[in-house]
Amino acid sequence: MTDAALELCGGTLPENIYYGIKKIITELAFHNLEIIEGVEQTLLALQGHYTLIVATKGDLTEQMGKFRSSGLAKYFHHCEVMENKDEKNYLELIAKHDIRPEELLMIGNSVKSDIAPVINIGGMAIHTPHDIVWVHEKMDMPESDRIIVVKRITDIVDFLL
């Protein structure tokens, strides 16, 4: 956010804009996370049966802070914060963890960031639609028999165990 403001302001931020941005970032960083109903129950069921990795995008400090404060870190082997969730970064992630594309199963609510790139590299995906999706994340679902759509996150357990 600060980088974008610097670019828009020609490399120098007026003091009032700097403090306004700092206030927004602080509010975002300390905003209480709302864990979707059934997430912890699902993770508890899957833990021990699968290597669970969080793949998220955004600012490293902010995302790791959210991950740690969520109370869900105990269920995961690793948390990967990517600049973009695209084919290149998913391939780097699975190479780092010695996972073949066909062994990768991504569970997520964004077709653009979670589902399509994983399908494009040969993985599988479970789409968990959410009422709120950023406009820049909207895209049509790819045609693939490697995609499952569930209504509730707890439905995942029925497919995987």
Question: What does each of the following model-derived ranges do?
Answer:
Residues Y18-Y19, E27-E34, V150-L161:
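Charge-rich, low-complexity terminal tails
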